[in-house]
């Protein structure tokens, strides 16, 4: 990957565009501290804004080589080389001993004659290094600092809270490292670093294509920030292994394949509205440049060394027009188009616009004139400014046919989207003089790419700006702050649910797994990743968690929750959840029968023994004698009737299965929810035969299904343990 110099206003890049240079790069020194601080001051960075990848090229040192104590300067041929005196070097061990006041291990004896004591090294014996046994103090275990402390058992409630507090939407990536956020086509991370440094590692790539991006970024980056100078097509997005969100900083998203990103589950973010005023100001500036030919006058004056006479000024002014009374046509009267029209009215321009999506009365409120056909719009405009969205209907809307309908000598201004103009047709119209001038801030072709034949290269009367209409120092900083905050939301929260500026949020949620897009309130342990145990988070997220396997923290009661943990759709359907719970309790009942009790296998050494005592409401209550977490499942008040109705139909004599009658036991909004989600959840539901279930539970023919107790504790909770439900 090419290396870029981090010195301000130095644009040198190694192997840039295939060119080679004999410059080399130096890292920012870490020690001594005074030298590091002087380096950071020279390049305008601080400890918070500096990144580890930053390098300084050798052109900022006298003679092209860095010497000891040198500070980089902008230009050594003009600026005097700065050099400081460094403090004496200290080894790591001596520095550590000095800070901790630890004496040297082998102090060197001073010679009586003052000579070097090197002669005494050969005469030293074993006793010189170790004190005599008589002077060695007796060993007292009570005072020994190495006495092992008694083991402290972890608080079971704290252990359970550690599991439940782990984020359910930690983005995919290596569990042993922090998330990686990459700035693809830039190198200044001074604004983003303070916002993201505590949750992610920020790296800059300064790449013009994905071929220049380091493999580590492609494999580990979960979020990306980008400007306009790099394009992400489908094949580019597929190179990123774990990318979840891309934020486009600036105006427009033409350089991102949003459709491909949606198919890959990548959220595309863009913050509109922060640059409306800036784009409108730049657009009006380009319009005035075309009318008054200011750009060509300035260019002629800067390129000519002799005095410019009246004849040359008159020659440069060919094609200029009076601003007042001219007609400005705005194609797309949205926020930017409206802002441009209001500014242009102050200069005496008559404003017309064509936008079939604007409500009636919008023109009267603004003082504009509305036209209802594209032909009338093109034929009446002296200058056309494009401010519409890019889509299938608007792509190439300025082409050879539409340009033929324009007045001769019309001006074209585009600060919106590059695909709105057919550049080949515009180049032909500029060369034959039908279009007197054009100002383009966005380009469909790469202007300086030698492998791309740009039709606009060499065209007369054209102003090209590098997608800078939105750029001001204040607006750029605001956009970067919003982008960093959005990336922080994606890392700490739910992606894309919590994103404010995601333009494909609904599509990503609709195309993704239905379980993943509804993790907000269904189940606290849903959608957590664990390398060996499904639906559990990595243990590195909770360093003080004492168990290598989270199941051990919950004891044997965790076995009763397995139906919920193994099937992510169960928390969304009370009927399916209760069916699986009944099946699990049936297995426990069969193991607890007198016939099988004598042949039960010995319990696992990790299983917590518990004493059983009857509960208050007909269910069995367990009181653990060893530290173990008590697992309780909350039952919402409005779901009680649904579960009881399902149990009644499950044990009914007609033998209907629970799956076929689940919808009839749910009322109101819950029934509609099941119907809308039926295609998603019915695949995961297990159809239970009622007769077979009654045989396994040893339940005879019941006239009143209410005799089966489901262990409702005060109408709010169900305590789940190893014992079968009371019948």
From Swiss-Prot:
Record-linked InterPro entries: CtBP, CTBP_dehydrogenase, D-isomer_2_OHA_DH_cat_dom, D-isomer_DH_CS1, D-isomer_DH_NAD-bd, NAD(P)-bd_dom_sf, THAP_Znf
Matching SUPFAM superfamilies: Formate/glycerate dehydrogenase catalytic domain-like, Glucocorticoid receptor-like (DNA-binding domain), NAD(P)-binding Rossmann-fold domains
Keyword terms: DNA-binding, Metal-binding, NAD, Repressor, Transcription, Transcription regulation, Zinc, Zinc-finger
Zn finger limits (THAP-type): 5-60
Compositionally biased tracts (Basic and acidic residues): 77-94
Keyword 4Fe-4S: no
Keyword Cell inner membrane among UniProt keywords: no
GO BP term, pick one: negative regulation of transcription by RNA polymerase II
Positions of region (Disordered): 64-158, 587-629, 652-681
Binding-site residues, NAD(+): 251, 331-336, 355, 388-394, 415-417, 441, 467-470
Domain of life assignment: Eukaryota
Protein's job: Binds DNA and represses gene expression. Plays a role in regulation of life span, possibly by regulating transcription of genes important for lipid metabolism.
Protein name: C-terminal-binding protein 1
Organism of derivation: Caenorhabditis elegans
């Amino acid at each position: 990957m090419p290396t870029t110099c981090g010195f301000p206003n130095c644009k040198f890049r190694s192997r840039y565009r295939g060119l080679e240079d004999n410059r080399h790069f130096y890292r920012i020194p870490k020690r001594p501290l005074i030298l590091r601080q002087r380096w950071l001051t020279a390049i305008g960075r601080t400890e918070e804004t500096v990144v580890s990848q930053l390098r300084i090229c050798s052109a900022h040192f006298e003679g092209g080589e860095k010497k000891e104590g040198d500070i980089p300067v902008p230009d050594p041929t003009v600026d005097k080389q700065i050099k400081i005196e460094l403090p004496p070097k200290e080894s790591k061990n001596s520095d550590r001993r000095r800070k901790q006041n630890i004496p040297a291990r082998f102090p060197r004896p001073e010679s009586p004659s003052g000579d070097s004591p090197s002669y005494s090294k050969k005469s030293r014996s074993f006793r010189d290094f170790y004190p005599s046994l008589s002077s060695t103090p007796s060993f007292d275990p009570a005072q020994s600092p190495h006495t092992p402390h008694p083991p402290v058992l972890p608080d079971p409630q704290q252990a359970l809270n550690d599991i439940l507090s782990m984020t359910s939407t930690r983005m995919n990536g290596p569990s042993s490292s922090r998330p990686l956020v990459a700035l693809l086509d830039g190198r200044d991370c001074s604004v983003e670093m303070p916002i993201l440094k505590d949750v992610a590692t920020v790296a800059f790539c300064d790449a013009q294509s994905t071929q220049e991006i380091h493999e580590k970024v492609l494999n580990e980056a979960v979020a990306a920030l980008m400007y306009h100078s790099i394009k992400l097509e489908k094949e580019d997005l597929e190179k990123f292994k774990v990318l979840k969100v891309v934020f486009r900083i600036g105006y427009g998203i033409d350089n991102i394949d949003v459709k491909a990103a949606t198919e890959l589950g990548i959220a595309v973010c863009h913050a509109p509205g922060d640059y409306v005023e800036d784009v409108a100001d730049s657009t009006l500036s380009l319009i005035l440049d075309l009318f008054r030919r200011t750009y060509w006058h300035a260019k002629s004056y800067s390129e000519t060394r002799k005095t410019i006479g009246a004849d040359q000024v008159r020659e440069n002014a060919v094609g200029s027009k009076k601003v007042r009374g001219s007609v400005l046509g705005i194609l797309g009267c949205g926020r930017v188009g409206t802002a441009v029209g209001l500014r242009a009215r102050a200069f005496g321009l008559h404003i017309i616009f064509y936008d079939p999506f604007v409500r009636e009365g919008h023109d009267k409120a603004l003082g504009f004139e509305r036209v209802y056909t594209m032909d009338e719009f093109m034929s009446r405009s002296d200058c056309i400014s494009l401010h519409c969205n890019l889509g299938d209907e608007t792509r190439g809307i300025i082409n050879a046919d539409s340009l033929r309908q324009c007045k001769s000598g019309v001006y074209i201004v585009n600060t919106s989207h590059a695909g709105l103009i057919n550049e080949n047709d515009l180049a032909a119209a500029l060369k034959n003089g039908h279009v007197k001038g054009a100002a383009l801030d966005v380009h469909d072709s790469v202007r300086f790419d030698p492998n791309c034949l740009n039709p606009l290269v060499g065209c007369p009367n054209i102003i090209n700006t590098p997608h800078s209409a939105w750029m001001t120092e204040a607006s750029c900083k605001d956009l970067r702050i919003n982008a960093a905050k959005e990336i922080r939301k994606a890392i700490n929260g739910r992606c894309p649910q919590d994103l404010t500026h995601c333009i494909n949020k609904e599509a990503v949620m609709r195309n993704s797994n239905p379980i993943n897009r509804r993790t907000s309130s269904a189940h606290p342990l849903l959608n957590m990743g664990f390398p060996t145990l499904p639906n559990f988070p990595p243990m590195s997220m909770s360093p003080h968690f004492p168990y290598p396997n989270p199941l051990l923290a919950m004891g044997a009661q965790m076995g009763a929750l397995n139906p919920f943990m193994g099937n992510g759709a169960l928390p969304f359907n009370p009927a399916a959840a209760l069916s699986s719970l009944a099946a699990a309790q049936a297995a426990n009942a069969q193991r607890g029968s007198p016939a099988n009790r004598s042949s039960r296998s010995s319990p696992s050494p990790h299983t917590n023994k518990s004493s059983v005592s009857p509960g208050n409401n007909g269910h069995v209550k367990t009181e653990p004698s060893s530290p173990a977490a008590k697992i309780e499942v909350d039952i919402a008040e409005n779901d009680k009737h649904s579960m009881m109705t399902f149990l009644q139909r499950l044990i009914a004599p007609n033998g209907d299965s629970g799956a076929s009658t689940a919808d009839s036991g749910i009322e109101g909004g819950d029934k509609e929810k099941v119907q809308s989600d039926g295609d998603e959840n019915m695949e995961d539901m297990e159809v239970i035969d009622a007769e077979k279930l009654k045989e396994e539970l040893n339940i005879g023919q019941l006239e009143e299904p209410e005799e089966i107790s489901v262990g409702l504790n005060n109408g709010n909770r169900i305590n789940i343990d190893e014992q079968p439900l009371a019948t």
